[in-house]
């Protein structure tokens, strides 16, 4: 059944003001892992404050390619990517509550 789930590229805002981009096929589970400190090494050192946006992809390969492209962008271009995402993806709320969207 997991093979049918879309993959998502997501962008987190970290406590130090930096962004973290990653991919997952379960946004809520992955975000909670980052909050617990069991996600990525980067987010253990720089805990996330909120999930800013996500974008679905049909498979892991396309999500991974998009992640690599996003990570190569300068901060201003990452903001442009964020602003281009649909506003219905997530609603703003504190990181300790759930996934967020500004």
UniProtKB/Swiss-Prot annotation:
UniProt cross-references to SUPFAM superfamilies, sorted A to Z: GIY-YIG endonuclease
Signal peptide segment: none
Pfam families: GIY-YIG
Residue span, GIY-YIG domain: 5-80
InterPro entries according to UniProt: GIY-YIG_endonuc, GIY-YIG_endonuc_sf, UPF0213_domain
Family: Belongs to the UPF0213 family.
Protein's recorded name: UPF0213 protein XAC3202
